[in-house]
Amino acid sequence: FFEKGIIGFPDCNQFTLISDLKEDGSPKGISWLQSLDEPAFALPVMDPLLVKEDYRPWIAEEMLKPLGDLNEENIYILVSVTATEDITKLSVNLKAPFIINAEERKGHQIIVEDDFPVKFMVYDILKAKKEEAGE
């Protein structure tokens, strides 16, 4: 439940996360944040650590309070993915992550104060990781 909706969609509060999972239960690659209020709306999202291993945005504690008690076991941080016809232009938005408490089923999209880009290009990073993994 996103009490305040998400940026650009303030009336979409109910979402489900659709993911293809690895053996450890973590999402692999791109997942979908599917609106239950507006069935035609689904947003591609991914774990930012897949493309920026040092991604640690500073988030004010009061922004996280509505989500309940967060810990490494129940927190998901996801970023939106933007794809164009040219797949090499694939990018993620590191400026406005989604913070989700999986146990409480509550989420919030936050604009972080850190100097992260709205368009962080990821195609080459993902391609290199696939090649490393032999895929």
What are these regions (language model features)?
Residues 54-59:
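Extended catalytic/binding region for NAD+/ADP-ribose chemistry, centered on the ART fold
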Residues 1-52, 72-135:
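Long, compositionally biased stretches
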Residues 61-71:
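Short active-site loop/helix that positions an aromatic residue
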